[in-house]
Amino acid sequence: MDAEKKSAHFRQISSYKPQLLVLSSIQENPSSKISEKANIKADNDAEIGVFGAEKYFSMKLDHVDSTADITKQHEKENTHDHPNANPNPNPNPHPHPHPQLTKTTSSRSKTSRHGTPSVRSESSCNSQTFLMRINNHNENKQRKMNDTSISFGGFRCYGPCSGVKTVHTDPKNSCKSRNSDRDFVAYDARKHNDKPRLHFEAKKADFHAQEKISLPIQRSDIAMNLERKLSLLTWDAIPNQLSTKNNNHNNNGNNSSMSSNTQEEETASVASSDLFEIENITSSVYEPSEASIGWSVVTGSMADQSVISDFDMMKRVTRNGPVVKTKPVIGEKVRSAGFLSGCKSHKAVSVVDSSRKVKETAKVDHHEMSHQKKFKTEIRIQDLSFL
């Protein structure tokens, strides 16, 4: 049983031997292989330079090629070292029993690109990325411009019209443009200009016809306006409409009718002036009646009475003369048992003076009234004396 286990273990080790050899060879001499590949790549970069960017536009990355070359070289070395070894004596249904080993190899192959890159290689990589961006940007612009088309005349321009390929002609549009040119050459301006001229002539004829109808009325109105302006704004100078019509009618007749027209105008002016004059309509004189005489006597007596009353008022003012100032007499003090004192106020003392003045004025008024009654009776007797 132990011998069988050992043989099985040996078989497994023999099946993984090529992979272990590959890893051991990479670990033992990594710098020599990478340095050789870096020198080869540096020489290629030196030959290409910055301006040989055509290789980079093919969108192929260098690290993929380098990893493929490295794996091929390792396989060749393994075949030279072990020519009689079977790569897979016992095929395993699982092709990758150790995924960690495969991951490490792939990661190392990817990371082991060039070693230490030179300044020229870095500049070439930077120029590569920059030029790739510019190229993609220009391609997008060209696609957008190709989508839009500009048409003018008989040509159609797809995008910017910089090259011959971008210009395309449409035969239909060109035929239309040629036909339109021919129509423009055959265009006759006289036919189209006749319409406005005929329209203007028709309007002119209508205008003359209206003038012929309305000329007599307008002339008479003009004559009336001129005569009014030339006149001095007097009632006699304003012409009558009937007289102006008669004048226009008689201008074609004999000169003998002018005198009759002037007479008619004079009579019309006199009639118009009579409206503003006041005439004496009541020329006859009537005898006065008794009622009118009585009314005149009453009005006259009232007028005389008003005059006499005014005269009496003037006399009264002159008779009175200047006003005499009276001093109030203060009464003696009267002793009383109560708290009341004697009358010391001026109002209580002046009552006697006011009563005296009222009595005097009453006497004067009575005398004047008696005198007026006598005068009225005398006036009435004098008025009735003429009957």
From Swiss-Prot:
Record keywords: Phytochrome signaling pathway
Compositional bias ranges of the Polar residues kind: 12-21, 114-128
Cellular compartments per GO CC: plasmodesma
Tagged with keyword Secreted: no
Compositional bias segments (type: Basic and acidic residues): 74-83
GO biological process, one term: phototropism
UniProt-annotated stretches for the region Disordered: 1-21, 74-128, 242-271
Source species, domain of life: Eukaryota
Biased composition (Low complexity): 242-261
Similarity remark: Belongs to the PKS family.
Described purpose of this protein according to its UniProt entry: Probably involved in the phytochrome signaling pathway.
Name of the protein described by the UniProt record: Protein PHYTOCHROME KINASE SUBSTRATE 3
Protein source organism: Arabidopsis thaliana (Mouse-ear cress)
Phylogenetic placement of the source organism: Eukaryota, Viridiplantae, Streptophyta, Embryophyta, Tracheophyta
